[in-house]
Amino acid sequence: MSNPKRPVSPVEEFIKAFHEMSARYGRSELWYDYIDMHAIALANTCDLRCKDVREKQYHAIVQKYDENTVQQFAVLTAITMTALLENPEQDFLGTVYHNLGLSKSRAGQFFTPYNVGQMMARMSMPDSFVLDKSRIWRVNDPCCGAGCLLLAGYNAMREQLESTDPDWDKYVLFVAQDIDPLACKMCYIQMCCIGVPGVVVAGNSLFPDAERAPTDFWFTHKYFALDEKALENTYQKTGIYGI
């Protein structure tokens, strides 16, 4: 009697589709372009300030590929979004990136395994926690990578607060930053997919006063659902508005 086939995981499904594309194009270039296209598509549905600039970048990428490959990019997008919607408790893109072996070529880069991030997030949460809704709470990761720690932090807070305080995420802002623009966009995609209210900043955290371009800021959809009164109160007290 033959053993039943093991179901194909979303990570395996993504890698299979990606390998089919990489037979004609370089893997690193394909990955960069996929991440750029997915991040831009998400950003341009909620943040119109940089829409034209990002739209031009998107079309410049599309023009590099034949129609079939462009359709395959859409398949990768669907796999990613479905995987994260069905299981928010994971660093999907970080796992795929590692399994493809792409991170090995980037010196000094290490992505925290999600189970480690999950443990750290749960250990950091107090047994009971009540939000002061007169202000915005901030959760920061100055070296976010693909977003493992922030995703785990969001999930830990949701697990503890959602049943008693359904609108808790209107008062918590998750701020991610990384010197690597690719990592920033991987983090941004995943934050958008699981509904994190936040912003991702591309830049060196050691130089917070450095001038940033508008396109260095990636706002998630849920950022725009933060409570306006709490945002204003936070600005009045700290001089910090939004980020």
Please report, for each region that a protein language model flagged, where it lies by residue:
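Short, charged/polar micro-motifs that form catalytic or ligand-binding hotspots
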Residues: M21-S28, R106-F111, V139, C143, ...
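Class I SAM-dependent transferase core
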Residues: D91-R122, P126
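Short, solvent-exposed secondary-structure capping/transition elements
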Residues: C46-K51, S105, F129-K133
